[in-house]
Structures are given as structure tokens and as C-alpha cells.
Amino acid sequence: MLLPILLHFLLLITQLNGSPAEVRLINDLMSGYVREERPTLDSSKPVVVSLGVFLQQIINLSEKEEQLEVNAWLKFQWRDENLRWEPTAYENVTDLRHPPDALWTPDILLYNSVDSEFDSSYKVNLVNYHTGNINWMPPGIFKVSCKLDIYWFPFDEQVCYFKFGSWTYTRDKIQLEKGDFDFSEFIPNGEWIIIDYRTNITVKQYECCPEQYEDITFTLHLRRRTLYYSFNLIAPVLLTMILVILGFTVSPETCEKVGLQISVSLAICIFLTIMSELTPQTSEAVPLLGVFFHTCNFISVLATSFTVYVQSFHFRNQHVHERMDFWMRFILLEWSPWLLRMKMPDRENNFQTLTESWKGRNRRESMARTAFEYADGPVTQIHSMGIMLKDNFEELIYQVKQEKIADEKGIERLRVLQKIYDHVKMIREHDDDNDEDSRVALEWRFAAIVVDRLCLLAFSLLIVVVSIIIALRAPYLFA
């Protein structure tokens, strides 16, 4: 019973102690090894360090904070002359694993890191080969600053880079070499496409130090996918702008005509607020999408102003406003209706009448009578009676003055005629005023309809032109 337990305990001790050859090899290598010493036999020569990046995933590119966050593996390779051995002397052991704090490692950091810990890589073991070559592949979540150009947002392309370099070793101590910029394990991002990448090494001398330092930069050229923004921002605004056009088809008598235009302006302001939350607070450039939204908002405000103007036309009358002058009448009641194939009730509107009206522009009345004129009826009879009474009354006055005859019957007759004349004159003037009021009101209402039709065409054309200009300015539309 005790024998199996004892054998299991001895086997466990053997596993914990590891291979005797590896233990002996580690002891031999670490004997006299100084971690702070550069691993080179000739101290005048630099240690050649190769650095590569295996990009796994683009986690986020924050436009608001101008930061790029990725998941990547770094691959460091260098040769440690103090860690070589002959495998046959150690039972053909060809490689060892060491913790990173046990061996010399280059103090290479990510210069443009914005992570709170600055160095966010995970400290994995180093692989030591018998030739002295060291492989070290620490994974990490790297967050770097990335200056964004938001002018073409959301049809934009951004260039971000990862700048690595030694913090203390100068160029004559560490020489950097380009490693692989690998995307074999890359997980595609839903918002960004990698269209180009490159690696370059630069030598720079800083003001703090007289020596030269090398750094290696891995650059990513990204292009934004536009489907999300086109579907959730651009398309709704275009549909909202259709309401601006449809607002001019509503009758000017409807009070909700102005309310519809104001609602459209408020809706566009909401989209502007959403866009401002997506872009950084910068005064260097205005995003293309912002230009489009502001233009649509301006068009909406302009449409609201014209709608108010149209309604003021519709409710005008002779008692409050003056009659149209010749140019307004010619443009709104003759030329524009002829151009738009519109016709005022009971009025001919063709090229001939347009020409005649233009030729008679110096006359005060250059338009034909409307449907409110009466050919025969009580009004005409009263008007004729007023003229007849006026003539008779003036003739009697003349006779009285000439003959100087003023008996009581004549005077009474004159008084009766005076009263009849005054009443008929009042009725005639009242009817003329009503007739004139109706004609003037009809002209203003027709002018309001004409302006509405002109705005319908003008704003439709304006929205189409603005949309085409914005689309042509974009570097690309679909990605």
C-alpha cells in the first residue's frame, strides 16, 4: 500500500527538478552572467535587434480622443554571445526558456503610447537557442496617439503609426533591423480597412542628448467603411430634406406649413449633435459630413423663411397692404405663371398677353378684368343710376344759379335729390370697394401659389446640386 505512494512521490520530485541536463546547462550559462552587460563579444560593436509586429486586431480608433487601440504581438530577435552552447554536451538540448528579468533585454519602448502603464505588453518568457539567438514575443494591447484628419469624415482615410525605440541605448549600442509586419492572424475590423502599411527606420538626435538614437516605425494606412454612416446619418437627412420640398406643396392656408419646416430644421440639428459627438473638438477642419448637414440646415431655414413669406402673400388685402407695382405683377402674375404653365382664373395667359402687358407697362392698369367683374346686374344699374342722378342734380343746380329761382318746391326737390344721390353714391362706392378688395386678395393669393411653385422647383434643384457636389468631393463613396 505504501509502495505506490512512495513511487508517485519520487516521480513528482523528479518532474519538479526537471531534466538534469537542462539544470546543468542553466547553471553553466548563468554562472557569471551579468544581466546589465550588453551581449556582445566586442563592446565597440552594437547589438543588432530585429523588431517585428504581428497585428491581431484593430480594437478601436477613437475619433473623439484621437487614439488607436490594437491587439498585437511584438517579435524581438537578437544574438546573445554569452548564451551559446554545444547541444551534444547537454543531451542534445537545443533551446531554453528564461523569464525576461533573468537575461539582458533591449529597453525598447513604444514612444507614442498613451496607455496609463506606458508599456502594456505581457512579459512572457524568452526562447534561447544554442546558437545564442534570442526570440521574445510579448503580446499586448497597445494604445497610441493618432493625429486624425477629419475633413473628409466619414469618407476619410487615416494614417497611424507605432514608433518603437530604445530609451537609453544610442545608435552605436543598439542597431535596429526591420522585422516582419505580419497580418496572417489579423481579424478584419467592421469599420476600418487596411489599405497599406510600411516600416521604416529613422535616426534622430534629440535636444537633450548629443548622441543619435534609432527608432523603427510601423505605419498603418486605414480607410473607413462608409455603410454605417450612410445608412444611419446621410440617408435619414436626405429623406428629411424631401419633407422640405413637400412642404411647398401644402396649401398656403395651412398653418402647419411653417411648423413642418421648423420640425425639419430641428431634426437636422439633432443629426449635427450626433456628428459632433463622433468627431474631435478641433478648429483645424470642418468634416465633410458637417458641411453637408449645415448646408441642409441652411436650406431648411431658408425654406422656412420663404414659407413665412408665402403665407404673408396669401393673407394680404387692399386695406393692409398696397397693391402690387408693375414689376411684381408682371413677374408673379404674368411671366412666372406663363413659365410654370399656370393660369389665373378667367384670365388668358399666353405669350401674346405677356407681350401686350410688357408694352403697356406705363399704364397703371395693365391687366384684364377678373371673374369678379360683373357685366350686367344690380351693381351696373345702381352705377348708371348714380351717374344719371349726378347729371340731373348738377343741371338743376346750374338752372337755379342761372335763373336765380329758388321757390320752396325747387329747394325741397334739390334736398331730396341730394339725399338720393348721396345714398346711391355710398352704395356704389361700397360695391366698388368690395369688388376691388376681392380682386386684390385674389391676386395676392395667386402670387402666393406662384411663389410656392417657384420655391418647390428651386429648392429641389438646390438639394440635388448640393448632394452631387458633396458626393463628388468625397475621395470615395463606398468601402
Curated annotation (Swiss-Prot):
<dbReference type="InterPro" id="IPR018000">
    <property type="entry name" value="Neurotransmitter_ion_chnl_CS"/>
</dbReference>
<feature type="disulfide bond">
    <location>
        <begin position="208"/>
        <end position="209"/>
    </location>
</feature>
<keyword id="KW-0407">Ion channel</keyword>
<dbReference type="GO" id="GO:0071316">
    <property type="term" value="P:cellular response to nicotine"/>
</dbReference>
<dbReference type="InterPro" id="IPR036734">
    <property type="entry name" value="Neur_chan_lig-bd_sf"/>
</dbReference>
<feature type="topological domain" description="Cytoplasmic">
    <location>
        <begin position="307"/>
        <end position="453"/>
    </location>
</feature>
<dbReference type="GO" id="GO:0043005">
    <property type="term" value="C:neuron projection"/>
</dbReference>
<dbReference type="GO" id="GO:0007268">
    <property type="term" value="P:chemical synaptic transmission"/>
</dbReference>
<feature type="transmembrane region" description="Helical">
    <location>
        <begin position="231"/>
        <end position="251"/>
    </location>
</feature>
<keyword id="KW-1003">Cell membrane</keyword>
<dbReference type="GO" id="GO:0042391">
    <property type="term" value="P:regulation of membrane potential"/>
</dbReference>
<dbReference type="GO" id="GO:0005231">
    <property type="term" value="F:excitatory extracellular ligand-gated monoatomic ion channel activity"/>
</dbReference>
<dbReference type="Pfam" id="PF02931">
    <property type="entry name" value="Neur_chan_LBD"/>
</dbReference>
<keyword id="KW-0472">Membrane</keyword>
<dbReference type="GO" id="GO:0034220">
    <property type="term" value="P:monoatomic ion transmembrane transport"/>
</dbReference>
<dbReference type="GO" id="GO:1904315">
    <property type="term" value="F:transmitter-gated monoatomic ion channel activity involved in regulation of postsynaptic membrane potential"/>
</dbReference>
<feature type="topological domain" description="Extracellular">
    <location>
        <begin position="19"/>
        <end position="230"/>
    </location>
</feature>
<feature type="glycosylation site" description="N-linked (GlcNAc...) asparagine">
    <location>
        <position position="200"/>
    </location>
</feature>
<feature type="transmembrane region" description="Helical">
    <location>
        <begin position="258"/>
        <end position="278"/>
    </location>
</feature>
<feature type="topological domain" description="Extracellular">
    <location>
        <begin position="475"/>
        <end position="479"/>
    </location>
</feature>
<feature type="signal peptide">
    <location>
        <begin position="1"/>
        <end position="18"/>
    </location>
</feature>
<keyword id="KW-0732">Signal</keyword>
<dbReference type="GO" id="GO:0015464">
    <property type="term" value="F:acetylcholine receptor activity"/>
</dbReference>
<dbReference type="InterPro" id="IPR006029">
    <property type="entry name" value="Neurotrans-gated_channel_TM"/>
</dbReference>
<dbReference type="InterPro" id="IPR036719">
    <property type="entry name" value="Neuro-gated_channel_TM_sf"/>
</dbReference>
<keyword id="KW-1133">Transmembrane helix</keyword>
<dbReference type="InterPro" id="IPR006202">
    <property type="entry name" value="Neur_chan_lig-bd"/>
</dbReference>
<dbReference type="InterPro" id="IPR002394">
    <property type="entry name" value="Nicotinic_acetylcholine_rcpt"/>
</dbReference>
<feature type="glycosylation site" description="N-linked (GlcNAc...) asparagine">
    <location>
        <position position="92"/>
    </location>
</feature>
<dbReference type="GO" id="GO:0045211">
    <property type="term" value="C:postsynaptic membrane"/>
</dbReference>
<dbReference type="Pfam" id="PF02932">
    <property type="entry name" value="Neur_chan_memb"/>
</dbReference>
<feature type="topological domain" description="Cytoplasmic">
    <location>
        <begin position="252"/>
        <end position="257"/>
    </location>
</feature>
<keyword id="KW-0813">Transport</keyword>
<feature type="topological domain" description="Extracellular">
    <location>
        <begin position="279"/>
        <end position="285"/>
    </location>
</feature>
<keyword id="KW-0628">Postsynaptic cell membrane</keyword>
<feature type="disulfide bond">
    <location>
        <begin position="146"/>
        <end position="160"/>
    </location>
</feature>
<feature type="transmembrane region" description="Helical">
    <location>
        <begin position="286"/>
        <end position="306"/>
    </location>
</feature>
<dbReference type="InterPro" id="IPR038050">
    <property type="entry name" value="Neuro_actylchol_rec"/>
</dbReference>
<protein>
    <recommendedName>
        <fullName>Acetylcholine receptor subunit alpha-type acr-15</fullName>
    </recommendedName>
</protein>
<dbReference type="InterPro" id="IPR006201">
    <property type="entry name" value="Neur_channel"/>
</dbReference>
<keyword id="KW-0406">Ion transport</keyword>
<dbReference type="GO" id="GO:0005886">
    <property type="term" value="C:plasma membrane"/>
</dbReference>
